[in-house]
Design a protein with these regions (language model features):
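Alpha-helical bundle regulatory/interaction domains
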Residues: 1-37, 41-197
Length: 197
């Protein structure tokens, strides 16, 4: 068997395991999910699971790391300027990334999810935005930091609500990006009249 075929099989197996884990996490906490339950759910041998992960916790850590790396990659491709026109494009790419792994994000950010993962996402996005704010408005930071924190928490809430909807019934990533940007800018303009972008 060629290496390419093996790689595709491995990718398919990992995708099935991830989707299965996401499904099970909508029903119960990660601590309650066993390897036996997961492999039976996705119809994979237990030995196949152990080729890739040592246990459920190890799998979850790998999944979280992959998702964080994907968001970080999106963020690195944009300059840290929160109120530029590129901000909307950046937000669209973030929402596309979230949408492409919707099941996993929904599970990780849902009621049986992982609060540390939510915090990692918030910290990653927040650091990028804060860097841009400091660069653009060095003399406004004392007050901007409160607006920034308010907007960041609001965006996380917006993302969570969006992820809980069925894809067919929810807004597109473009619509969510536009809505997020408008909400952020309305808060910033209201609280900081000198910022008129």
């Amino acid at each position: 068997m060629t290496e390419q075929k093996i790689d595709k099989r491995v990718a398919r197996t990992k995708t099935r395991l991830k989707e299965g884990l996401a499904d099970l996490m909508t029903r119960k906490s990660i601590q309650e999910i066993t390897v036996k339950e997961l492999v039976e759910y996705v119809h994979i041998n237990r030995s196949t699971f152990y080729l890739h992960y040592s246990d459920i916790s190890n799998m979850l850590e790998n999944v979280k790391r992959e998702l964080i790396e994907e968001i970080a990659e999106v963020m690195e491709s944009y300059p840290p300027e929160p109120f530029s026109e590129e901000s909307v494009v950046f937000m669209k790419d973030v929402f596309f990334s979230l949408g492409s792994n919707r099941k996993l994000y929904r599970s990780l950010m849902g009621k049986n999810g992982d609060p540390s993962f939510v915090q990692q996402v918030e910290d990653l996005v927040g650091e990028k935005c804060l860097t841009g704010l400091k660069r653009q408005f060095p003399n406004e930071m004392n007050m901007l930091k409160y607006s920034y924190r308010f907007c960041l928490s609001g965006c996380v809430g917006l993302i969570r609500s969006w992820l809980q909807k069925d894809p067919e019934d929810s807004e597109t990533p473009e619509e969510m990006a536009d809505q997020s940007f408008r909400l952020i800018m309305s808060v910033i303009r209201e609280t900081h009249p000198r910022i008129r972008r």
